[in-house]
Design a protein with these regions (language model features):
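Solvent-exposed edge beta-strands and adjacent loop segments
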Residues: 1-102, 148-168
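Short beta-strand and beta-hairpin "edge-sheet" elements
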Residues: 77-79, 130-183
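Beta-strand secondary-structure signal
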Residues: 100-104, 172-176, 223-226
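Short, acidic/charged, Gly/Pro-enriched secondary-structure junctions
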Residues: 106-147
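Extended Gly/Ser/Thr-rich low-complexity repeat segments
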Residues: 116-126, 188-196, 202, 236
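Surface-exposed beta-loop interaction hotspot
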Residues: 181-216
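Beta-strand-rich structural segments
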Residues: 210-235
Length: 236
């Protein structure tokens, strides 16, 4: 059984001060693996400053790119009840329940954004969470490496909800994290304003903004040295 240590155990004492993880305020989506087969993650040996994350967000290789979400609200992050087996009215643990994650986006919600989110559904995607306390939250199953939470393929679904007389236009996104994600492996990087050095999160991840898709028109005024081409946002 997962996390069951036969013949030994874990001490239950705690230090006088323990870190707390704030509620999610943003997500950072990325593919699990790059096209070169290398896992996308953050390491304690990385210098986690502005240039590092700007490079990931603007990465020309989309398999290694980081996709920040907008501000997320009405977050529901719950793990379901465990799967058990009943024998003689005794419930035996079989496996942990699924961890589902639901959120809404109000600022910037549009049908075009719904389409952008749903394009990720069939891909092997992962997501870091960014807390209101500017922490990047992920999985530290292996010491020194913070991995994004793996998303079960084909569970990510975005639904556009039009505005009404009493409610704003918004986007609702739901997903299920992989059964391989264990809550006991959750860890995070704390933001340290003015910090320097390897493994120090020296830039506020709440400030991250994703790239914006554009539609390119027909080139005109073409010469040896220049041309003009109109570009418009897909959002109008």
């Amino acid at each position: 059984m997962s996390n069951c240590l036969c013949g030994t155990g874990k001490n239950l004492g705690q230090p006088g001060c323990t870190g707390k993880i704030g509620r999610p305020q943003k997500g950072l989506l990325t593919r699990r693996l790059g096209n070169d087969g290398v896992e996308n993650n953050l390491k304690l040996t990385d210098v986690l400053g502005s240039s590092f994350f700007t490079g990931l967000i603007n990465q020309s290789d989309i398999s290694k790119r980081l996709y920040p979400t907008g501000t997320i609200v009405n977050v529901v992050d719950e793990r379901g009840d465990p799967v058990t087996y009943n024998a003689d009215n005794i419930e035996y643990f079989s496996s942990q329940g699924n961890r589902t994650f639901t959120f809404e986006i109000i600022d910037g919600a549009s049908p075009q954004l719904e389409k952008a989110y749903n394009n990720f559904r069939c891909q092997d995607m992962c997501m870091y969470l960014v807390s209101v306390d500017s922490q990047i939250v992920g999985n530290e199953r292996n010491a020194g490496i913070l991995r994004p939470f793996r998303i079960e393929k084909n569970t990510l679904y975005a639904k556009y909800i039009p505005a009404t007389a009493t409610t704003p236009e918004r986007l609702m996104v739901t997903l299920t994290f992989s059964v391989l994600e264990k809550d006991g492996d959750i860890s995070y990087f704390n933001y340290t304003e003015g910090g320097t050095g390897a493994g120090v999160l020296a830039v506020n991840p709440l400030d991250f903004q994703g790239l914006v898709d554009v539609t390119m028109g027909t080139a005109t005024g073409i010469s040896v040295t220049a041309f003009t081409i109109p570009m418009t946002y897909i959002y109008g």
